[in-house]
């Protein structure tokens, strides 16, 4: 069988996804004891893993370095990539929200300034609402922007809401729910069809049996 290379994102999503691979019989022991390594071979299958930053997973898949990738839907929404989105894994569930200080008025007709790491998603959301806003792109922690008067509100991913609460912010609008997705390189889906669909089908059955 041909080798299948899977790109995973480091961090929180990785911890959600490793159990799914183990449940379909793919050994992930090296991943769980990785140290500083970034490339891993499953001991009992033809699968290898690479660990990269979340924003780079889709790029590795698009260019064929990885056959399969596991990435948050937020990355796919913000960055258009020429890949196939095959499966919603149902883990890593979060939501995009509009949040601000308690005195914020989302119904104000004044043009709002919105700080975010996700300008494309934010622009699309407000365009669909028919609302013209100024978007301020921030790379670091966006929670501070309303507190310092840089922006009226923020658009960010919320999981538990603890970070917002600690900074005195509240959610005003829930925009989109997101989760981890399995993506596939278009060429690999033709040349390694059997191997890739075997993983997809087993993963899908595991997800369905767990519901």
Curated annotation (Swiss-Prot):
PROSITE patterns registered for this protein in UniProt: ATP_P_PHORIBOSYLTR (PS01316)
The protein's name: ATP phosphoribosyltransferase
EC supergroup of this enzyme: transferase
Gene3D superfamilies: Periplasmic binding protein-like II
Pathway(s) served: Amino-acid biosynthesis; L-histidine biosynthesis; L-histidine from 5-phospho-alpha-D-ribose 1-diphosphate: step 1/9
Function, as annotated: Catalyzes the condensation of ATP and 5-phosphoribose 1-diphosphate to form N'-(5'-phosphoribosyl)-ATP (PR-ATP). Has a crucial role in the pathway because the rate of histidine biosynthesis seems to be controlled primarily by regulation of HisG enzymatic activity.
Classification via Pfam families: HisG (PF01634)
MF-aspect GO terms: ATP binding; ATP phosphoribosyltransferase activity
Domain notes: Lacks the C-terminal regulatory region which is replaced by HisZ.
Stated family: Belongs to the ATP phosphoribosyltransferase family. Short subfamily.
Record carries keyword Transferase: yes
Keywords from the named record: Amino-acid biosynthesis, ATP-binding, Cytoplasm, Glycosyltransferase, Histidine biosynthesis, Nucleotide-binding, Transferase
């Amino acid at each position: 069988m041909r080798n299948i290379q899977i790109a995973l994102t480091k961090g929180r999503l990785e911890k959600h996804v490793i159990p799914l691979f183990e449940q379909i019989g793919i050994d992930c022991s090296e991943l769980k004891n990785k140290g500083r390594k970034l490339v891993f071979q499953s001991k009992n299958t033809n699968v290898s893993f690479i660990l990269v930053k979340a924003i780079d997973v889709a790029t590795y898949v698009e260019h064929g370095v990885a056959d399969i990738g596991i990435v948050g839907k937020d990355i796919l929404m913000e960055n258009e990539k020429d890949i196939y989105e095959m499966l919603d894994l149902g883990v890593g569930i979060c939501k995009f929200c509009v949040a601000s200080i308690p005195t914020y008025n989302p119904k104000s007709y004044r043009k709002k300034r919105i700080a975010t790491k996700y300008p494309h998603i934010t622009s699309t959301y407000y365009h669909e609402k028919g609302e013209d806003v100024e978007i301020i792109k921030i790379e670091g922690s966006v929670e501070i922007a309303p507190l310092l008067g840089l922006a009226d509100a923020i658009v960010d991913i919320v999981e538990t809401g603890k970070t917002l609460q600690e900074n005195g912010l509240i959610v005003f609008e829930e925009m989109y729910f997101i989760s981890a997705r399995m993506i596939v390189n278009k060429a690999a889906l033709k040349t390694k069809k059997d191997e890739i669909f075997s993983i997809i089908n087993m993963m899908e059955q595991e997800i369905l049996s767990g519901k």
